[in-house]
Amino acid sequence: MGLSAHNKDLMTDRRTFFSAAAAAAAAATATPLAVAAQAAPRQPLLMPRRLQPGDTVALINPSAAVYERQPYEVAHDTLKALGFKVKEAPHLRARRGQFAGTDAQRASDVNAMFADPQVHGILALTGGSGGNRILPLLDYELIRRHPKFLGGFSDITALINAVHARTGLVTFHAPVGVSEWNDFSVSHFRAAVMAGESPTLRNPKSNEDALAPKSNRTFTVRGGKAQGPLVG
């Protein structure tokens, strides 16, 4: 049985509608990081200089606002214990709703700390949310001209991945300023960021009083050797 012209028009309209809806959904779910990564050709690797005691590390906050005094004190004390001088980005303590200042303020802090010749490394104070909102506002060419350590994790992942994708700068998944910098974290940070050593990833020693520890057990999914860049 054939279709009438009216039914054919309805089917065409439905196909057009669903195609447009799918395209709109894909565009709506595309994050600034995904757009930045897709738009940028692969960049040659830029290695930041190793941090050394006496260097100045800037604290930035690209994400959530911090409402108490203690997190700032902890971040300062931690970096000083590592041997660094500490500089706060101009809007580190700013607040705008749930974020640490406006998008423009948070982005300008990132740009300014990369441009500052007195700053040798940049560490995020905390994570949270909102870091992806500043990615289109970053000056990636400026960052490429002034490569330096950039570290953080959680919501800061968007920032460090976007900077790497757009500039080639090797960035670091690292504790943020308010993290608990235990022996495990400090030893890996010093090895990778200060000594330039290739890290060996292993679980911390267990303090369980048992012949066969139950926590943090590891197993091999598929044995063998692999080689390649570690990104993510």
Q: Where are the regions that the model predicts?
A:
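C-terminal segment of N-terminal export signals and the immediately downstream linker at the start
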Residues: 32-66, 70
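Mature catalytic domains of secreted/periplasmic carbohydrate-active enzymes
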Residues: 91, 136-138, 160-170, 179-180, ...
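Short, acidic/small-residue loops that bind anionic groups at enzyme active sites
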Residues: 140-162, 170-177
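N-terminal small/polar loop signature for handling phosphorylated ligands or for N-terminal nucleophile
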Residues: 90-147
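Conserved anion/nucleotide-ligand pocket segment
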Residues: 172, 176-232
